[in-house]
Amino acid sequence: MPSMTSKVFAITGGASGIGAATCRLLAERGAAVICLADVSSTNFTSLQESIAKSNPSTLVHCTELDVRSADKVDQWLQSIVSTHGDLHGAANVAGIAQGAGLRATPTILEENDAEWSRILDVNLNGVFYSTRAQVRVMKDLPPGHRSIVNVASIAAFSHVPDVYAYGTSKSACAYLTTCIAADVFWSGIRVNCVSPGITNTPMLPQFEPKAKSLDEIKDMYRDQGYPTGEADGVARTIVWLLSEDSIPVYGANINVGACPP
């Protein structure tokens, strides 16, 4: 089991779902400092309390942050290094969903310009701004193992026509990750990507706004061959990629859960 003792991590979208699960697991593995950012501060206190129970030694710093702002992302990453003197790893989990459901055919005619821009702004631009800022601060730190993990989605592979913006943003996230990985590998920074399948997070019901319950959503996806996974499973893959145990791996996009072949 990889140890994260004495290490400093930054997690976007860290207050709920996969991001929160990643923060909790990093603390369980002994992380010294976890700096999490999220657009909503609602869960900050409860997550800090949860982490304190599992590992009182882990320092948790929460920042309200909109990853659509490149300047604010830069400031956040710079403040982490200024305060803690290092940044060993980062996971860019922040993202938003797109409601599917039944729409008229062809669905591209119903793709809303504002929704298209909003989703790509968070899911693609936010990942780009975050990864760029992380590379910027990491490259000037002393030599050592440094790793960045971005979160794409099963939607990058499934070609579902009623979530154009979401699928496009996640496909682009995966492509961006592999390009950055090749670019910064010789700087001692590994960059990888995970693509979760259907995952039980607070975002899941947003994909199916017409469903009456979470169980209905799970049953629907199961009937399509996609059983619903849990955030902890994705977090374990992210933490492995952040750890030295995964040092041979860079530029990968790892499917987690039920995904198309």
UniProtKB/Swiss-Prot annotation:
| Pfam families registered for this protein in UniProt | adh_short_C2
Q: What start and end residues bound the annotated signal peptide?
A: 1-20
Q: Where does NADP(+) bind?
A: 18, 66, 132, 166, 170, 201
Q: Which UniProt keywords apply?
A: Alkaloid metabolism, Glycoprotein, NADP, Oxidoreductase, Signal
Q: Which domain of life is it from?
A: Eukaryota
Any Gene Ontology biological process: indole alkaloid biosynthetic process
Known glycosylation sites: 43
Name the reaction it catalyses: chanoclavine-I + NAD(+) = chanoclavine-I aldehyde + NADH + H(+)
To which pathway does this protein belong?
A: Alkaloid biosynthesis; ergot alkaloid biosynthesis
UniProt EC number: 1.1.1.332
Q: Where is the active site?
A: 166, 170
Q: Which SUPFAM superfamilies match?
A: NAD(P)-binding Rossmann-fold domains
What Gene Ontology molecular function terms does this protein carry? oxidoreductase activity
How it assembles, according to the record, is: Homotetramer.
What role does it play?
Answer: Chanoclavine-I dehydrogenase; part of the gene cluster that mediates the biosynthesis of fungal ergot alkaloid. DmaW catalyzes the first step of ergot alkaloid biosynthesis by condensing dimethylallyl diphosphate (DMAP) and tryptophan to form 4-dimethylallyl-L-tryptophan. The second step is catalyzed by the methyltransferase easF that methylates 4-dimethylallyl-L-tryptophan in the presence of S-adenosyl-L-methionine, resulting in the formation of 4-dimethylallyl-L-abrine.
- Family per UniProt? Belongs to the short-chain dehydrogenases/reductases (SDR) family.
> Matching PANTHER family, A to Z?
3-OXOACYL-(ACYL-CARRIER-PROTEIN) REDUCTASE (AFU_ORTHOLOGUE AFUA_6G11210), DEHYDROGENASE_REDUCTASE FAMILY PROTEIN, PUTATIVE (AFU_ORTHOLOGUE AFUA_6G03520)-RELATED
Q: Kindly provide the name given to this protein in its UniProt entry.
A: Chanoclavine-I dehydrogenase easD
Provide the species name: Claviceps purpurea (strain 20.1)
